[in-house]
Amino acid sequence: MAVVEIEEIPALLQSGQTIAGLDLGTKTIGLAVSDLGLSFAHPRPVIKRVKFSIDAQVLLKALDADKVGVIVIGLPMNMDGTSGPRVQATRAFVRTMQPLTDLPFVFWDERLSTVAAERALIGMDVSRGKRADRIDSAAASFILQGALDRLHSIRRSASDDYDAG
């Protein structure tokens, strides 16, 4: 399926489906999955990158196991809002994944998600070695939680509009 806007997610999700968050690294893919209520992001084990065909197969299997209906993927914009090589790599990953799945993708600005994830892991007194193993999934959780919070805000706004009308 295509890349969609976050506002389109409620119409695309079927009952019992979750939303996945991805943080693409050069060596790993961080993965997080929402609960069925679409309120909380839960980190999953990172996927160690080998080559695209293997990475895609492992990722799609994990997404299927969690009944994912939409993928939110972090878009690593520069702090000034411009696109750099990592944005291009993320867009290329999505373009290459699209023929392999019917799942829609949503790009989500991930600026500072890795920094926030690392601070959270440090705050939990996770050792440097374990932080390296968990950082991408923790960042995926921050990306997904941001998207879930936005969805909640959209639903609340729609409910307020309905109540007012």
Curated annotation (Swiss-Prot):
UniProt EC number: 3.1.-.-
Entry keyword set: Cytoplasm, Hydrolase, Nuclease, Ribosome biogenesis
Enzyme type, top EC level: hydrolase
Cytoplasm keyword on record: yes
Record Pfam families: RuvX
Cross-referenced InterPro entries: RNaseH-like_sf, YqgF, YqgF/RNaseH-like_dom, YqgF/RNaseH-like_dom_sf
Main location: cytoplasm
Molecular function in Gene Ontology: nuclease activity
Protein name (record): Putative pre-16S rRNA nuclease
Protein's organism: Brucella anthropi (strain ATCC 49188 / DSM 6882 / CCUG 24695 / JCM 21032 / LMG 3331 / NBRC 15819 / NCTC 12168 / Alc 37) (Ochrobactrum anthropi)
